[in-house]
Amino acid sequence: MARPAKPAEEPQVEALCCELGFRLPPAAVTGLTVYLNMLQKWSAVMNLVGPRTWQPMVRTLIVDSLHLDRFLRDAVPQCGPQIWDFGAGAGLPGIPLRMVWQHGEYHMVDVREKRTMFMQMVLARHPLSGTFVHRARVEDFMADRAPADMLVSRAFMPWPELLSLLEGRIRQGGHVIVLANEPAPDHDRPDAAHGRPLPSGWDLTAQYVYEVEGSARYFWALSSKKAPS
């Protein structure tokens, strides 16, 4: 039987984040250590994430949240208060993001019971202001809510279907933030994965690229040009 993985300790987590180029405040280091240890423990018995130990979790998963913090501060500095995160899964990128970026109300939505239970337990252990977990279909979640100011999507669904789903659900001037493995499309430039140009109701307002273990990853900021009906 394999030995249980050693738990993360705050000095180790802080040092690894510094190695990756991120100097975190003490409260974020504490919260991230709690999260990593819970993620490591739960992933030993269920398929929450691919990595099973905390170091590769930081290098390949948490790093997305830390880069996303930088991107949002630069690309969407005046974001409104209602932020949605669909298909939040194990709380990535949302929970680590909220440890360093506390803007507005951040609503993580997932239909899967065990994943929402995990996120709720993390927030019970380490509360994050303005951060909420919802177990629901996204269609039901959106049904009785005003349009959002921003939506974050990491592998929830292909972006063309996502923008169709969000028709009338993002306020005019609001943003959809897509975490992707390829450059963003534009109105006259289809994307590589789907061969689709950006629809006329959206503008690409910012893009960010970074490298994780030799592969490029991207954030797209897509701004809604239409007022909700």
Swiss-Prot record:
Q: Name a GO CC annotation attached to this entry.
A: cytosol
Q: Which InterPro entries match?
A: rRNA_ssu_MeTfrase_G, SAM-dependent_MTases_sf
Q: Which reaction does it catalyse?
A: guanosine(527) in 16S rRNA + S-adenosyl-L-methionine = N(7)-methylguanosine(527) in 16S rRNA + S-adenosyl-L-homocysteine
Q: Which Pfam families match?
A: GidB
Q: What is its main location?
A: cytoplasm
The protein's Enzyme Commission number: 2.1.1.170
User: Where does the chain bind S-adenosyl-L-methionine?
Assistant: 87, 92, 138-139, 154
Q: Where in the cell is it found?
A: Cytoplasm
Key words, A-Z: Cytoplasm, Methyltransferase, rRNA processing, S-adenosyl-L-methionine, Transferase
What GO MF terms are annotated? rRNA (guanine-N7-)-methyltransferase activity
Q: Where is the signal peptide?
A: none
Q: What does it do?
A: Specifically methylates the N7 position of guanine in position 527 of 16S rRNA.
Q: Which PANTHER family match?
A: S-ADENOSYL-L-METHIONINE-DEPENDENT METHYLTRANSFERASES SUPERFAMILY PROTEIN
Against HAMAP family, the record matches this protein to: 16SrRNA_methyltr_G (MF_00074)
Similarity comment = Belongs to the methyltransferase superfamily. RNA methyltransferase RsmG family.
Query: What name does UniProt use for this protein?
Result: Ribosomal RNA small subunit methyltransferase G
Q: Which species does the entry assign this protein to?
A: Oleidesulfovibrio alaskensis (strain ATCC BAA-1058 / DSM 17464 / G20) (Desulfovibrio alaskensis)
